[in-house]
Amino acid sequence: MKNRLVIFGLLILLMMSSCIVYHPMPIDIPLISEKNDFRVDAGISIVPSANATVSYGLTDKIAIQGFGSVGADDRYYIQAATGLYKNKGNNKVFELYGGFGYGYGNAYKDANPGNLLGDYQLYFGQANFGKISSSSSNFETGFGLKAGYLHSNLTDKNYYGWTSETGPFKIYHDESILFEPVGFIRFGGNRLRINVKLGGTLIYKFTNKDRNLPYSYLNLGIGLNYRL
């Protein structure tokens, strides 16, 4: 019964993949612990996309990170962040990042039919905490919480309702707040590990509240994580 529920949930996510502008991004939580600590993460997600993250300990306190994702229906997202990290001992690490993201989405509704498409910008902060590998274990786990301001510019090509076959079409400029919790586990070898991430998204719009922003609430990512 539980397996059927899991399969049903995954099928729903796949069916929703063409119906959304935004989805939770499977960005790596690196848990940088020292200067020159370097991680490369690459994988895929249930909401169809391929992604990669690069993270680096620039100094004894400062880390930088870059992320990119490409998906179905011409969706893409790129992000850059910088932040502070602290190795709290006993293999536990705390990170605090701030950054900017830019993306493009295209949602399709076959009831009209119509599309809602355009770009968005995200200004965010994120806190991460977790436990990294030790001499006795290669297992790593942790969680993070991202919060930010989301500005979107989406063109309504008969998505909310039929208006015209050729346009002009209305463009919605919306302001929203975004929350994204994420958890992960990494396991495998000393340097190369399998990385599994489960993330969620909650978006609250301040403008055009009668026009919902189509997005996925959950996303599951899996990939490989390499630490130099």
Segments the model singles out, each with a brief description of its role:
Residues 1-26, 228:
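Cleavable N-terminal export/targeting peptides
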Residues 19-74:
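Short glycine/proline- and aromatic-enriched beta-strand/turn motifs that initiate or cap beta-hairpins
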Residues 31-35, 57-63, 104-110, 160-165, ...:
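Flexible, solvent-exposed coil segments and beta strand-coil junctions
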Residues 36-38, 46-52, 62, 76-82, ...:
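Hydrophobic, lipid-facing positions within transmembrane beta-strands of outer-membrane proteins
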Residues 40-44, 66-70, 80, 96-104, ...:
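Transmembrane beta-barrel strands of outer-membrane/channel proteins
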Residues 50, 60-66, 87-94, 136-141, ...:
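Repeated loop/turn-to-beta-strand initiation elements of outer-membrane beta-barrel proteins
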Residues 72-135:
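Ligand-binding grooves and catalytic loops that recognize ribose/phosphate and carbohydrate rings
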Residues 109-228:
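Outer-membrane beta-barrel transmembrane domain signature
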